[in-house]
Swiss-Prot record:
Organism (species): Vibrio cholerae serotype O1 (strain ATCC 39315 / El Tor Inaba N16961)
Protein name: 3-ketoacyl-CoA thiolase
Family annotation (CDD domains): thiolase (cd00751)
One Gene Ontology cellular component: cytosol
Subcellular location: Cytoplasm
Pathway(s) per entry: Lipid metabolism; fatty acid beta-oxidation
PROSITE patterns from the UniProt entry: THIOLASE_2
EC number: 2.3.1.16
Gene: fadI
Length: 435
Protein backbone atom coordinates (compact mmCIF):
# COMPACT_ATOMS: atom_id res chain seq x y z
CA UNK A 1 0.00 0.00 0.00
CA UNK A 2 1.33 3.43 -0.90
CA UNK A 3 1.76 6.41 1.36
CA UNK A 4 -0.93 8.38 -0.46
CA UNK A 5 -4.61 7.47 -0.72
CA UNK A 6 -6.42 9.38 -3.46
CA UNK A 7 -9.80 8.43 -2.05
CA UNK A 8 -12.75 9.96 -0.25
CA UNK A 9 -13.26 9.38 3.46
CA UNK A 10 -15.59 6.51 2.61
CA UNK A 11 -12.91 4.86 0.46
CA UNK A 12 -14.16 5.82 -3.00
CA UNK A 13 -11.55 6.60 -5.64
CA UNK A 14 -11.32 9.76 -7.72
CA UNK A 15 -12.34 8.82 -11.24
CA UNK A 16 -11.67 10.60 -14.52
CA UNK A 17 -14.71 10.14 -16.76
CA UNK A 18 -13.94 12.41 -19.72
CA UNK A 19 -11.09 14.22 -21.39
CA UNK A 20 -10.99 16.42 -24.46
CA UNK A 21 -8.86 19.07 -26.09
CA UNK A 22 -8.90 21.46 -28.98
CA UNK A 23 -6.46 20.84 -31.77
CA UNK A 24 -3.15 22.46 -30.88
CA UNK A 25 -2.14 25.20 -33.33
CA UNK A 26 1.20 26.91 -33.81
CA UNK A 27 1.35 30.53 -32.75
CA UNK A 28 -0.33 32.95 -35.19
CA UNK A 29 -2.01 30.27 -37.30
CA UNK A 30 -5.61 28.99 -37.10
CA UNK A 31 -6.19 30.25 -33.54
CA UNK A 32 -4.30 33.48 -34.14
CA UNK A 33 -7.23 35.69 -33.10
CA UNK A 34 -8.77 33.44 -30.45
CA UNK A 35 -8.08 34.36 -26.80
CA UNK A 36 -7.40 31.59 -24.29
CA UNK A 37 -10.69 32.12 -22.48
CA UNK A 38 -12.61 31.33 -25.68
CA UNK A 39 -10.49 28.22 -26.28
CA UNK A 40 -11.31 27.12 -22.74
CA UNK A 41 -15.04 27.69 -23.19
CA UNK A 42 -14.93 25.82 -26.48
CA UNK A 43 -13.41 22.64 -25.07
CA UNK A 44 -15.44 22.54 -21.85
CA UNK A 45 -18.71 23.09 -23.73
CA UNK A 46 -17.90 20.25 -26.13
CA UNK A 47 -16.76 17.89 -23.37
CA UNK A 48 -20.01 18.37 -21.47
CA UNK A 49 -22.01 17.80 -24.65
CA UNK A 50 -20.15 14.56 -25.37
CA UNK A 51 -20.74 13.18 -21.89
CA UNK A 52 -24.40 14.29 -22.08
CA UNK A 53 -24.13 15.48 -18.50
CA UNK A 54 -26.39 18.24 -17.22
CA UNK A 55 -24.07 21.27 -16.88
CA UNK A 56 -25.90 22.20 -13.68
CA UNK A 57 -24.37 19.09 -12.02
CA UNK A 58 -20.84 20.51 -12.27
CA UNK A 59 -19.95 21.76 -8.81
CA UNK A 60 -16.46 23.13 -9.35
CA UNK A 61 -14.23 24.28 -12.19
CA UNK A 62 -10.49 24.75 -11.66
CA UNK A 63 -8.78 26.03 -14.77
CA UNK A 64 -5.41 27.54 -15.53
CA UNK A 65 -3.80 30.03 -17.84
CA UNK A 66 -0.09 30.85 -17.87
CA UNK A 67 -0.11 33.83 -20.24
CA UNK A 68 -2.54 35.96 -18.25
CA UNK A 69 -4.92 38.42 -19.90
CA UNK A 70 -5.88 41.43 -17.73
CA UNK A 71 -9.44 41.49 -19.08
CA UNK A 72 -10.16 37.93 -17.89
CA UNK A 73 -8.08 37.31 -14.74
CA UNK A 74 -10.24 34.37 -13.58
CA UNK A 75 -10.54 32.17 -16.67
CA UNK A 76 -12.30 29.42 -14.69
CA UNK A 77 -15.20 31.66 -13.73
CA UNK A 78 -15.53 32.97 -17.30
CA UNK A 79 -15.80 29.37 -18.50
CA UNK A 80 -18.59 28.67 -16.01
CA UNK A 81 -20.50 31.77 -17.08
CA UNK A 82 -20.03 31.02 -20.78
CA UNK A 83 -20.95 27.33 -20.96
CA UNK A 84 -24.38 26.93 -19.38
CA UNK A 85 -23.31 25.79 -15.94
CA UNK A 86 -25.13 27.00 -12.86
CA UNK A 87 -24.09 30.49 -11.83
CA UNK A 88 -23.54 28.96 -8.39
CA UNK A 89 -20.78 26.67 -9.68
CA UNK A 90 -17.57 27.37 -7.79
CA UNK A 91 -14.68 28.38 -10.03
CA UNK A 92 -11.13 29.56 -9.51
CA UNK A 93 -7.96 29.74 -11.55
CA UNK A 94 -4.49 28.35 -10.90
CA UNK A 95 -1.09 28.64 -12.48
CA UNK A 96 1.93 26.36 -12.13
CA UNK A 97 3.61 27.24 -15.43
CA UNK A 98 3.79 24.16 -17.69
CA UNK A 99 2.31 21.92 -14.97
CA UNK A 100 -0.79 24.08 -14.55
CA UNK A 101 -3.46 21.57 -15.54
CA UNK A 102 -1.83 18.90 -13.37
CA UNK A 103 -2.35 21.32 -10.50
CA UNK A 104 -5.93 21.98 -11.59
CA UNK A 105 -6.62 18.22 -11.67
CA UNK A 106 -5.13 17.75 -8.20
CA UNK A 107 -7.18 20.61 -6.78
CA UNK A 108 -10.44 19.12 -8.07
CA UNK A 109 -9.37 15.66 -6.88
CA UNK A 110 -8.67 17.02 -3.40
CA UNK A 111 -12.10 18.69 -3.30
CA UNK A 112 -13.64 15.31 -4.11
CA UNK A 113 -11.46 13.57 -1.51
CA UNK A 114 -12.54 16.09 1.12
CA UNK A 115 -16.20 15.49 0.33
CA UNK A 116 -16.75 19.09 -0.77
CA UNK A 117 -17.91 18.12 -4.27
CA UNK A 118 -18.81 15.06 -6.32
CA UNK A 119 -18.14 16.41 -9.82
CA UNK A 120 -15.57 18.89 -11.11
CA UNK A 121 -13.78 19.99 -14.26
CA UNK A 122 -10.06 20.74 -14.48
CA UNK A 123 -7.93 21.98 -17.33
CA UNK A 124 -6.05 24.81 -18.90
CA UNK A 125 -5.88 27.05 -21.93
CA UNK A 126 -3.25 29.33 -23.37
CA UNK A 127 -2.78 31.54 -26.39
CA UNK A 128 0.68 32.53 -27.54
CA UNK A 129 -0.98 34.60 -30.27
CA UNK A 130 -3.37 36.82 -28.28
CA UNK A 131 -0.92 38.32 -25.82
CA UNK A 132 -0.94 41.21 -23.36
CA UNK A 133 1.35 43.74 -25.05
CA UNK A 134 2.77 46.18 -22.54
CA UNK A 135 3.92 49.79 -22.74
CA UNK A 136 7.01 51.51 -21.37
CA UNK A 137 7.03 52.61 -17.75
CA UNK A 138 7.27 56.25 -18.82
CA UNK A 139 4.26 55.97 -21.13
CA UNK A 140 2.27 54.13 -18.46
CA UNK A 141 3.03 56.87 -15.92
CA UNK A 142 2.16 59.58 -18.45
CA UNK A 143 -1.16 57.95 -19.34
CA UNK A 144 -2.05 57.72 -15.66
CA UNK A 145 -1.14 61.37 -15.14
CA UNK A 146 -3.04 62.31 -18.32
CA UNK A 147 -6.26 60.94 -16.87
CA UNK A 148 -5.96 63.41 -14.01
CA UNK A 149 -5.27 66.56 -16.07
CA UNK A 150 -8.03 69.09 -16.69
CA UNK A 151 -6.84 71.41 -19.46
CA UNK A 152 -5.60 70.84 -23.00
CA UNK A 153 -2.39 72.64 -22.11
CA UNK A 154 -1.65 70.24 -19.29
CA UNK A 155 -2.28 67.28 -21.57
CA UNK A 156 -0.01 68.62 -24.31
CA UNK A 157 2.77 69.32 -21.81
CA UNK A 158 2.66 65.74 -20.59
CA UNK A 159 2.65 64.29 -24.10
CA UNK A 160 5.52 66.52 -25.23
CA UNK A 161 7.81 64.81 -22.72
CA UNK A 162 7.41 61.44 -24.46
CA UNK A 163 9.98 60.28 -27.00
CA UNK A 164 9.36 57.92 -29.91
CA UNK A 165 11.09 55.17 -27.93
CA UNK A 166 8.64 55.67 -25.05
CA UNK A 167 5.75 54.92 -27.43
CA UNK A 168 7.12 51.58 -28.58
CA UNK A 169 5.22 48.50 -27.29
CA UNK A 170 7.00 46.22 -24.83
CA UNK A 171 6.88 42.55 -25.87
CA UNK A 172 5.94 39.90 -23.27
CA UNK A 173 8.86 38.67 -21.20
CA UNK A 174 10.19 35.22 -22.08
CA UNK A 175 12.83 35.03 -19.35
CA UNK A 176 12.53 33.92 -15.74
CA UNK A 177 11.83 36.94 -13.56
CA UNK A 178 14.28 35.84 -10.88
CA UNK A 179 17.23 34.92 -13.11
CA UNK A 180 16.72 36.55 -16.50
CA UNK A 181 17.27 33.15 -18.13
CA UNK A 182 14.91 31.82 -20.78
CA UNK A 183 13.75 28.21 -20.91
CA UNK A 184 15.81 27.73 -24.05
CA UNK A 185 18.97 28.97 -22.36
CA UNK A 186 18.37 26.54 -19.52
CA UNK A 187 17.83 23.69 -21.99
CA UNK A 188 21.12 24.63 -23.66
CA UNK A 189 22.88 24.60 -20.28
CA UNK A 190 21.44 21.16 -19.50
CA UNK A 191 22.52 19.82 -22.89
CA UNK A 192 26.10 20.87 -22.12
CA UNK A 193 26.06 19.81 -18.45
CA UNK A 194 24.72 16.32 -19.19
CA UNK A 195 26.52 15.75 -22.49
CA UNK A 196 23.37 15.57 -24.60
CA UNK A 197 24.50 15.71 -28.22
CA UNK A 198 22.78 17.49 -31.08
CA UNK A 199 22.28 14.13 -32.79
CA UNK A 200 20.51 12.69 -29.74
CA UNK A 201 18.23 15.71 -29.51
CA UNK A 202 17.34 15.61 -33.19
CA UNK A 203 16.69 11.86 -32.98
CA UNK A 204 14.25 12.34 -30.10
CA UNK A 205 12.43 15.12 -31.95
CA UNK A 206 12.18 12.93 -35.06
CA UNK A 207 10.86 10.07 -32.92
CA UNK A 208 8.25 12.32 -31.33
CA UNK A 209 6.94 13.60 -34.66
CA UNK A 210 6.99 10.15 -36.24
CA UNK A 211 5.03 8.55 -33.39
CA UNK A 212 2.53 11.43 -33.24
CA UNK A 213 1.94 11.27 -36.98
CA UNK A 214 1.47 7.50 -36.72
CA UNK A 215 -0.97 7.93 -33.81
CA UNK A 216 -3.07 10.35 -35.84
CA UNK A 217 -2.94 8.12 -38.93
CA UNK A 218 -4.12 5.12 -36.88
CA UNK A 219 -7.03 7.09 -35.41
CA UNK A 220 -5.73 6.93 -31.84
CA UNK A 221 -5.96 10.68 -31.24
CA UNK A 222 -9.13 11.46 -33.17
CA UNK A 223 -11.69 10.98 -30.39
CA UNK A 224 -9.82 13.09 -27.85
CA UNK A 225 -9.57 16.14 -30.14
CA UNK A 226 -12.63 18.21 -31.03
CA UNK A 227 -13.23 20.05 -34.28
CA UNK A 228 -12.85 23.75 -33.56
CA UNK A 229 -14.69 26.49 -35.42
CA UNK A 230 -13.00 29.74 -34.39
CA UNK A 231 -14.62 33.06 -35.18
CA UNK A 232 -15.66 34.24 -37.75
CA UNK A 233 -16.64 30.59 -38.32
CA UNK A 234 -15.48 30.46 -41.94
CA UNK A 235 -12.96 27.65 -41.39
CA UNK A 236 -12.29 24.86 -38.95
CA UNK A 237 -9.39 22.95 -37.46
CA UNK A 238 -9.70 19.29 -36.54
CA UNK A 239 -6.10 18.21 -35.94
CA UNK A 240 -2.81 19.55 -34.62
CA UNK A 241 -0.90 21.60 -37.16
CA UNK A 242 2.62 21.33 -35.75
CA UNK A 243 3.21 17.62 -36.38
CA UNK A 244 5.62 16.80 -39.20
CA UNK A 245 3.63 14.09 -40.91
CA UNK A 246 6.63 13.10 -43.05
CA UNK A 247 9.45 13.73 -40.59
CA UNK A 248 12.93 12.94 -41.93
CA UNK A 249 15.83 12.74 -39.50
CA UNK A 250 18.31 14.37 -41.87
CA UNK A 251 16.21 17.54 -42.13
CA UNK A 252 16.73 18.36 -38.44
CA UNK A 253 20.46 18.84 -38.91
CA UNK A 254 19.86 21.78 -41.26
CA UNK A 255 18.68 24.14 -38.53
CA UNK A 256 21.01 26.50 -36.70
CA UNK A 257 21.18 26.59 -32.90
CA UNK A 258 18.66 29.02 -31.45
CA UNK A 259 20.17 30.03 -28.09
CA UNK A 260 23.92 29.58 -28.45
CA UNK A 261 24.64 30.35 -32.08
CA UNK A 262 28.28 29.28 -31.97
CA UNK A 263 28.43 26.23 -29.73
CA UNK A 264 24.80 25.33 -29.07
CA UNK A 265 22.70 22.30 -29.95
CA UNK A 266 19.15 23.38 -29.06
CA UNK A 267 17.24 24.36 -32.20
CA UNK A 268 13.69 25.29 -33.13
CA UNK A 269 13.22 21.74 -34.44
CA UNK A 270 14.22 19.97 -31.22
CA UNK A 271 12.21 22.38 -29.03
CA UNK A 272 8.47 22.59 -28.60
CA UNK A 273 6.93 25.56 -30.44
CA UNK A 274 4.77 28.35 -29.03
CA UNK A 275 1.24 26.99 -29.32
CA UNK A 276 -2.43 27.90 -28.85
CA UNK A 277 -4.95 25.44 -27.42
CA UNK A 278 -7.02 24.18 -24.51
CA UNK A 279 -7.66 20.86 -22.77
CA UNK A 280 -9.97 19.69 -20.00
CA UNK A 281 -10.86 16.60 -17.97
CA UNK A 282 -13.91 15.75 -15.87
CA UNK A 283 -13.38 14.16 -12.46
CA UNK A 284 -15.96 12.48 -10.22
CA UNK A 285 -16.35 10.54 -7.05
CA UNK A 286 -16.28 6.92 -8.21
CA UNK A 287 -19.77 6.15 -6.90
CA UNK A 288 -21.24 9.22 -8.56
CA UNK A 289 -19.83 8.22 -11.94
CA UNK A 290 -21.39 4.77 -11.61
CA UNK A 291 -24.68 6.28 -10.44
CA UNK A 292 -24.79 8.43 -13.61
CA UNK A 293 -23.89 5.45 -15.79
CA UNK A 294 -20.68 7.02 -17.07
CA UNK A 295 -17.74 4.95 -18.29
CA UNK A 296 -14.70 5.51 -16.10
CA UNK A 297 -11.52 6.22 -18.06
CA UNK A 298 -9.24 5.71 -15.08
CA UNK A 299 -8.17 6.86 -11.64
CA UNK A 300 -5.51 9.06 -10.07
CA UNK A 301 -3.33 6.75 -7.99
CA UNK A 302 -0.88 9.34 -6.63
CA UNK A 303 0.69 12.70 -7.38
CA UNK A 304 3.65 14.82 -6.33
CA UNK A 305 5.12 18.23 -6.98
CA UNK A 306 8.72 19.33 -6.48
CA UNK A 307 10.65 22.60 -6.47
CA UNK A 308 14.36 23.01 -7.19
CA UNK A 309 16.90 25.75 -7.85
CA UNK A 310 16.55 27.99 -10.89
CA UNK A 311 20.13 29.05 -11.58
CA UNK A 312 20.89 25.77 -13.37
CA UNK A 313 19.07 22.55 -14.27
CA UNK A 314 15.77 24.39 -13.81
CA UNK A 315 13.94 21.88 -16.03
CA UNK A 316 14.97 18.82 -14.00
CA UNK A 317 11.68 18.77 -12.06
CA UNK A 318 10.54 15.32 -13.30
CA UNK A 319 13.62 13.70 -11.77
CA UNK A 320 12.66 15.09 -8.36
CA UNK A 321 8.87 14.68 -8.47
CA UNK A 322 8.71 11.20 -10.03
CA UNK A 323 10.38 9.21 -7.20
CA UNK A 324 7.97 10.81 -4.72
CA UNK A 325 4.91 9.92 -6.82
CA UNK A 326 6.15 6.34 -7.25
CA UNK A 327 6.71 5.97 -3.51
CA UNK A 328 3.30 7.41 -2.72
CA UNK A 329 1.70 4.95 -5.12
CA UNK A 330 3.65 2.07 -3.58
CA UNK A 331 5.17 1.05 -6.91
CA UNK A 332 8.45 1.13 -8.84
CA UNK A 333 9.35 2.31 -12.32
CA UNK A 334 9.20 -1.29 -13.54
CA UNK A 335 5.53 -1.55 -12.53
CA UNK A 336 4.55 1.07 -15.10
CA UNK A 337 2.93 0.17 -18.40
CA UNK A 338 3.47 3.66 -19.87
CA UNK A 339 5.63 6.68 -19.14
CA UNK A 340 4.70 10.07 -20.61
CA UNK A 341 7.08 12.97 -20.02
CA UNK A 342 6.44 16.50 -21.24
CA UNK A 343 8.98 17.28 -23.95
CA UNK A 344 9.63 21.00 -23.51
CA UNK A 345 12.98 20.46 -25.21
CA UNK A 346 14.68 17.30 -26.38
CA UNK A 347 17.68 18.27 -24.24
CA UNK A 348 15.59 18.58 -21.07
CA UNK A 349 13.82 15.28 -21.76
CA UNK A 350 17.04 13.37 -22.36
CA UNK A 351 18.73 14.92 -19.31
CA UNK A 352 15.86 13.79 -17.09
CA UNK A 353 15.96 10.28 -18.55
CA UNK A 354 19.67 10.13 -17.71
CA UNK A 355 19.03 11.21 -14.13
CA UNK A 356 16.24 8.65 -13.69
CA UNK A 357 18.96 6.02 -14.15
CA UNK A 358 21.77 7.76 -12.21
CA UNK A 359 22.66 6.36 -8.79
CA UNK A 360 24.98 9.34 -8.27
CA UNK A 361 22.14 11.81 -8.85
CA UNK A 362 19.82 9.81 -6.59
CA UNK A 363 22.34 9.76 -3.75
CA UNK A 364 23.62 13.33 -4.02
CA UNK A 365 20.44 15.19 -4.98
CA UNK A 366 17.57 13.05 -3.73
CA UNK A 367 19.08 11.38 -0.67
CA UNK A 368 18.08 7.98 -2.02
CA UNK A 369 20.22 4.85 -1.98
CA UNK A 370 19.80 4.21 -5.69
CA UNK A 371 18.18 5.50 -8.86
CA UNK A 372 14.56 4.73 -9.70
CA UNK A 373 15.87 3.01 -12.82
CA UNK A 374 16.45 3.20 -16.53
CA UNK A 375 13.39 3.94 -18.64
CA UNK A 376 12.29 1.25 -21.09
CA UNK A 377 11.89 3.34 -24.26
CA UNK A 378 9.21 0.97 -25.56
CA UNK A 379 7.00 2.43 -22.79
CA UNK A 380 8.09 6.04 -23.21
CA UNK A 381 6.02 8.70 -25.00
CA UNK A 382 4.62 5.99 -27.22
CA UNK A 383 2.31 8.37 -29.09
CA UNK A 384 4.87 11.14 -29.39
CA UNK A 385 5.08 14.14 -27.11
CA UNK A 386 5.02 17.90 -26.85
CA UNK A 387 7.81 18.32 -29.40
CA UNK A 388 5.28 17.14 -31.97
CA UNK A 389 1.89 18.12 -30.58
CA UNK A 390 2.96 21.55 -29.36
CA UNK A 391 2.64 23.07 -25.93
CA UNK A 392 -0.12 25.51 -24.93
CA UNK A 393 1.40 25.88 -21.48
CA UNK A 394 -1.63 25.39 -19.22
CA UNK A 395 -3.23 22.73 -21.45
CA UNK A 396 -0.42 20.20 -21.73
CA UNK A 397 -1.07 18.33 -18.48
CA UNK A 398 -4.71 17.66 -19.33
CA UNK A 399 -3.67 16.52 -22.82
CA UNK A 400 -1.21 14.07 -21.32
CA UNK A 401 -3.71 12.68 -18.80
CA UNK A 402 -6.39 12.04 -21.44
CA UNK A 403 -3.96 10.62 -23.98
CA UNK A 404 -2.34 8.31 -21.43
CA UNK A 405 -5.62 6.95 -20.04
CA UNK A 406 -6.91 6.16 -23.52
CA UNK A 407 -3.69 4.38 -24.46
CA UNK A 408 -3.70 2.39 -21.21
CA UNK A 409 -7.25 1.29 -22.01
CA UNK A 410 -6.17 0.12 -25.46
CA UNK A 411 -3.43 -1.96 -23.81
CA UNK A 412 -5.81 -3.61 -21.38
CA UNK A 413 -5.15 -1.40 -18.37
CA UNK A 414 -2.23 -0.85 -16.03
CA UNK A 415 -0.32 1.98 -14.42
CA UNK A 416 1.22 5.03 -16.06
CA UNK A 417 3.39 7.98 -15.12
CA UNK A 418 2.76 11.51 -16.35
CA UNK A 419 5.51 13.98 -15.49
CA UNK A 420 6.47 17.50 -16.49
CA UNK A 421 9.03 20.18 -15.84
CA UNK A 422 7.85 23.75 -15.32
CA UNK A 423 9.28 27.25 -15.16
CA UNK A 424 10.52 28.38 -11.79
CA UNK A 425 12.27 25.07 -11.11
CA UNK A 426 9.00 23.20 -10.60
CA UNK A 427 8.17 19.59 -11.38
CA UNK A 428 5.00 17.51 -11.42
CA UNK A 429 4.36 13.77 -11.48
CA UNK A 430 1.13 11.80 -11.44
CA UNK A 431 0.45 8.07 -11.41
CA UNK A 432 -2.67 7.04 -13.33
CA UNK A 433 -4.45 3.69 -13.18
CA UNK A 434 -6.78 1.94 -15.61
CA UNK A 435 -8.45 -1.35 -14.69
Amino acid sequence: MGKQEVRTRSGERVAIVAGLRTPFARQSTEFGQVPAVDLGKMVVQEMMARTAIDPKLIEQVVFGQVVQMPEAPNIAREIVLGTGMSINTDAYSVTRACATSFQAAVNVAESIMAGSIDIGIAGGADSSSVLPIGVSKKLAASLLALSKTKTVGQKLKLLSNLSFKDLMPVPPAVAEYSTGLSMGQTAEQMAKSYAISRAEQDALAHRSHTLAAQAWAEGKIRDEVMTAFPEPYKKWLDMDNNIRMDSKLESYAKLRPAFDRQYGSVTAANSTPLTDGAAAIMLMREGKAKELGLEIMGYIRSYAFAAIGVEKDMLMGPSYATPIALDRAGITLNDLTLIDMHEAFAAQTLANLKMFASDKFAQEQLGRAQAIGEVDMSKFNVLGGSLAYGHPFAATGARMITQTLRELKRRGGGLALNTACAAGGLGAAMILEVE
